[in-house]
């Protein structure tokens, strides 16, 4: 059995909830649809819900089984912001936290902090430095870790 098959079997045995903040990217959307169809993870697209659905329709990509967190939904943003502000790891004041609810990359990381997803996956549209900075700011570093590397 090859490495990729082993990894697929391990993922399918214990699917994680994964947030994808770059779902508007066609390559990412196709990958997320395939992951969901193969039940390798519970996929969560984070972005403009209407635009994600429109792009999926245009591209002929099924979003069946994929949760969408719509960053344009003001009511959902307010509820998420309230939860985040009460979390001990929140480093922002109310206005700063509210701004981050509408930014897919930061919202995905906040979902991770809140335990709504296990992990966030990005890097096709966002620069590595932006991802590291957002992750370090919102999620933070593990105890004993003081240096970040993208290698």
Each language-model region and where it sits:
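Short beta-strand elements
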Residues: 149-151
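A glycine- and small-aliphatic-rich helix-loop capping segment at beta-alpha/alpha-beta transitions
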Residues: 127-147
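Contiguous, glycine/small-aliphatic-enriched amphipathic segments in soluble metabolic enzymes
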Residues: 1-128, 134
């Amino acid at each position: 059995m090859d490495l990729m098959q082993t990894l697929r079997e391990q993922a399918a045995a214990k699917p994680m909830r994964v947030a994808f903040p770059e779902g508007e990217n066609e390559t990412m959307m196709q990958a997320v649809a395939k992951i969901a169809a193969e039940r390798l993870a519970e996929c969560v697209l984070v972005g403009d819900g209407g635009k994600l659905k429109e792009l999926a329709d245009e591209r002929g990509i099924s979003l069946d089984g994929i949760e969408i967190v719509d960053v344009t939904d003001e009511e959902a943003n307010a509820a998420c912001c309230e939860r985040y502000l009460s979390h001990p790891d929140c480093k922002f004041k109310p206005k700063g936290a509210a701004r981050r609810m509408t930014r897919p990359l930061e919202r995905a990381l906040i979902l991770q902090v809140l335990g709504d997803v296990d992990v966030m996956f990005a890097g096709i549209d966002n620069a590595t430095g932006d991802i590291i900075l957002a992750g370090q700011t919102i999620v933070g570093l593990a105890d004993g870790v003081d240096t970040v590397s993208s290698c």
